[in-house]
């Protein structure tokens, strides 16, 4: 297993991180336990969770993914073998079951970390991340930016001050951001530098062959500021496995179960996926192998977060990271570039 430094810390994390957002919804706790056992056996010791998981977020299942991990820690005693990441939810009018509607203020962050620590059955988090911004900006695939400063809500300096307090208390070892913009990332970095607060060590954003916006602006920040990308959705909600080619939606698949996961459910995405499928086939690879290998070979990527709903998927995904794409294959992905008009 290949490992990379988490930002400017002395923590080595694997190029593969274990995503957990299906545990408690598409996967049972027992299946989550099996995935954690197997991941560790393969050297994958970086687990990424969130207080709102599993997805889609519901009051009935809120926090269940963290509970699954916490019970596994209690059963196995392997907390110290894992670099554990979780997230505090940003502002959302649709999640009133979370503290009446989550915010990134000091009191909300305090309640969030206390809840996560209890559910995870641990006394510290290795990486605590802001799941999405408080302010009115673009994330989760939103296009067409509109500027509404009056709707910004809790300012970044207040959020970072609260996070820094958790670091000072030892409840959190490092902090990161997620679903952020170049401006947001630089604001966190500026405030940390000016006020002597903890610096963000990672940014967890979407990155895959169908969604490469990170390369514009954020990739340079990641490399110059040592804030590596934790790439989520490297298979684009499973679209880049090829299983949806031809408009098929297999029973039990994410796109069949949940209509809200429609970011890549379009004719353009289908055409791009089909083109990538042919490139992979020409080079003796599965589409999954090529898609994952492409992401992890980017110099700005620290770790690629993979999730699976069954063990065969997990094995295939981990195996894919043993593949190194030749320059010719990478060049073909750039030359084809069916993503120019995509998400």
Regions found by a protein language model. Give the residues of each.
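Surface-exposed, active-site-proximal loop segments in enzymatic domains
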Residues: 60, 90-103, 136-145
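Beta/alpha (TIM)-barrel catalytic core signal, keyed to glycine-rich beta->alpha loops juxtaposed to Asp/Glu
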Residues: 133-328
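N-terminal binding-site loop/beta-alpha segment at the start of enzyme catalytic domains
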Residues: 1-86, 123, 162
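Active-site mouth loops of central-metabolism enzymes
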Residues: 21-30, 97-107, 148-151
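Aromatic/hydrophobic pocket-lining residues that form the small-molecule binding cavity
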Residues: 32, 65, 109, 113, ...
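Short, acidic/polar
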Residues: 28-39, 105-118, 189
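Conserved, mostly hydrophobic/aromatic
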Residues: 6, 18, 47, 69, ...
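Conserved small/polar residues in nucleotide/adenosyl-binding loops
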Residues: 333-339
């Amino acid at each position: 297993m290949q490992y990379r430094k988490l930002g400017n810390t002395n923590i080595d994390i694997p190029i593969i991180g274990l995503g957990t957002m299906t545990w408690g919804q598409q996967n049972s706790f027992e299946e989550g336990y099996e995935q954690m056992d197997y991941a560790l056996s393969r050297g994958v010791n970086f687990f990424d969770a969130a207080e709102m998981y599993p997805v889609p977020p519901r009051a009935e299942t809120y926090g269940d993914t963290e509970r699954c991990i916490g019970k596994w820690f209690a059963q196995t005693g392997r907390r110290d073998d894992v670099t554990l990441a979780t997230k505090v939810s940003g502002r959302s009018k649709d999640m009133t079951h979370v503290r009446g509607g989550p915010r990134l203020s000091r009191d909300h962050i305090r309640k969030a970390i206390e809840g996560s620590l209890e559910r995870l059955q641990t006394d510290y988090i290795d990486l605590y991340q802001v799941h999405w911004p408080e302010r009115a900006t673009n994330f989760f695939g939103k296009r067409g930016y509109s500027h509404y400063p009056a709707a910004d809500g809790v300012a970044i300096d207040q959020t970072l001050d609260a996070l820094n307090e958790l670091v000072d208390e030892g409840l959190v070892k490092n902090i990161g951001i997620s679903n952020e913009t170049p401006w947001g990332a630089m604001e966190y970095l500026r405030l940390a530098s000016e006020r002597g607060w903890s610096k963000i060590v990672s940014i967890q954003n979407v990155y895959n062959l169908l969604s490469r916006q990170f390369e514009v602006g954020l990739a340079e920040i990641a490399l110059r500021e040592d804030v590596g990308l934790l790439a989520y959705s490297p298979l684009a909600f499973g679209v880049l496995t090829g299983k949806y080619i031809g408009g098929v939606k297999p029973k039990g698949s994410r796109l069949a179960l949940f209509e809200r996961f429609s970011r890549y459910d379009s004719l353009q995405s289908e055409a791009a996926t089909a083109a990538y499928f042919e490139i992979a086939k020409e080079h003796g690879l599965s589409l999954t192998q090529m898609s994952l290998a492409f992401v992890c070979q980017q110099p700005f990527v620290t770790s690629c977060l993979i999730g699976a709903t069954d063990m065969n998927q997990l094995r295939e995904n981990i195996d894919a990271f043993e593949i190194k794409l030749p320059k010719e294959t990478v060049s073909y992905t750039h030359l084809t570039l069916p993503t120019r008009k995509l998400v």
